[in-house]
């Protein structure tokens, strides 16, 4: 989730691509051991949750409402949802229905109670890695992808974004919010992920046939973690 790796930046995606199965299985093993709590979802940085949600809400509200190019408020998809922290505080207050997808069944089981009364507005809980997940076409107004793209290889990220584009309703929006490295690709062997720089993320977005329509840096996060940027894609 929140990458605190301070390793020297190197381009390692080539190595990862050669051993996809262990890249994914090691990540699944890591998350299986993480407690199903907000602090667990945020790598021990539970204290930043409110700042994160406030920033995301301000970002998202620029696109919601009536009028040309505005996004509907029908259904959202929370990718890498964990226990539903983002669904509970960001998506369910703004959308009628939310679907959750995560690779760890224990987190999705916890989400059913963590979401409280709002759980009745959850459409589906999908237990699946994003590299294999196929969202239903023409279903979502917002697809929210936060702190999870580092768990996908370049090719799988591009393919997933293409599937997400097909899953959008008219005027729908894909949002990526994630850590970005200062240069290149930085591997994190602890949770079996990578952190890419912004230029690489933008290039992969372009390969998926999408364009960045708005971009912001999340402010007021601890200085020791990588910068976090939010990108709206169409």
Where are these regions (language model features)?
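Extreme N-terminal basic, low-complexity initiation segments
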Residues: 2-4
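Class I (Rossmann-like) S-adenosyl-L-methionine-dependent methyltransferase catalytic domain
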Residues: 6-136, 152-163, 172-234
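A conserved beta-strand element that flanks and buttresses the S-adenosyl-L-methionine
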Residues: 144
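Hydrophobic adenine-recognition pocket in adenosine-nucleotide-binding enzymes
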Residues: 148
């Amino acid at each position: 989730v929140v990458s605190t790796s301070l390793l020297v930046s190197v381009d390692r995606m080539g190595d990862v691509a050669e051993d996809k199965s262990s890249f994914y299985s090691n990540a699944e093993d890591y998350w299986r051991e993480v407690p199903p709590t907000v602090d667990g979802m945020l790598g021990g940085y539970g204290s930043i949750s409110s700042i994160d949600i406030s920033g995301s809400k301000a970002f998202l509200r620029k696109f919601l409402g009536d009028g040309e190019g505005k996004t509907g408020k029908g259904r959202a998809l929370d990718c890498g949802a964990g226990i539903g922290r983002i669904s509970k505080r960001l998506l369910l207050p703004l959308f009628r229905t939310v679907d959750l997808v995560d690779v760890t069944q224990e987190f999705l089981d916890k989400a059913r109670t963590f979401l409280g009364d709002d759980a009745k507005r959850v459409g589906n809980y999908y237990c699946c890695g994003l590299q294999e997940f196929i969202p239903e076409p023409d279903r979502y107004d917002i697809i929210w992808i936060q702190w999870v793209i580092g768990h996908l290889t370049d090719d799988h990220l591009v393919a997933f974004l293409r599937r997400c584009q097909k899953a959008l309703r008219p005027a729908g929006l894909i949002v990526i919010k994630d850590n970005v490295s200062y240069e290149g690709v930085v591997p994190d062997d602890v949770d079996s992920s990578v952190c890419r720089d912004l230029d690489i993320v933008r290039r992969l977005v372009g390969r998926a046939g999408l364009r960045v329509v708005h971009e912001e840096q999340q402010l007021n996060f601890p200085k020791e973690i990588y910068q976090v940027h939010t990108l709206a894609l169409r």
